[in-house]
Amino acid sequence: MTESNRSLDDLSPARVTTAFDLPGHTTVRSLGVAQGIVVRSRSIVGSFGASLQTIFGGNITLYTSLCEKAREQAFDKMLAEACKLGANAIVAMRYDSTEIGSGVTEVICYGTAVQVAHAAGA
């Protein structure tokens, strides 16, 4: 289903933005912060493989893959929470991460859950 055919009752990734408003839409209600948190650890095997990659330099693909999966999971959890709040869009979306222990990283995705309507003339 394309974004133009999707009901404004539905929250889709296409209506998530890092901007403070959604182009072509008017915010009619702010519902609060929606967030998704994922805590991931590296396996011993993964850490060993990544250590080998550091010998040669360049992109450490094992860690890149782990980070991408964690961000995707945090994003999906944020969308689910925003849906529970009744949102059909999220504005001011951000990611943050923190190492909370040796080899353990928290990834958070958060934004303001809102209800939007098509702007007049848009």
From Swiss-Prot:
Domain of life assignment: Bacteria
Cleavable signal peptide: none
Pfam families per UniProt: YbjQ_1 (PF01906)
InterPro entries: UPF0145_dom_sf, UPF0145_YbjQ-like
Family: Belongs to the UPF0145 family.
HAMAP family found in the cross-reference section: UPF0145 (MF_00338)
Protein name (record): UPF0145 protein BceJ2315_57450
Organism: Burkholderia cenocepacia (strain ATCC BAA-245 / DSM 16553 / LMG 16656 / NCTC 13227 / J2315 / CF5610)
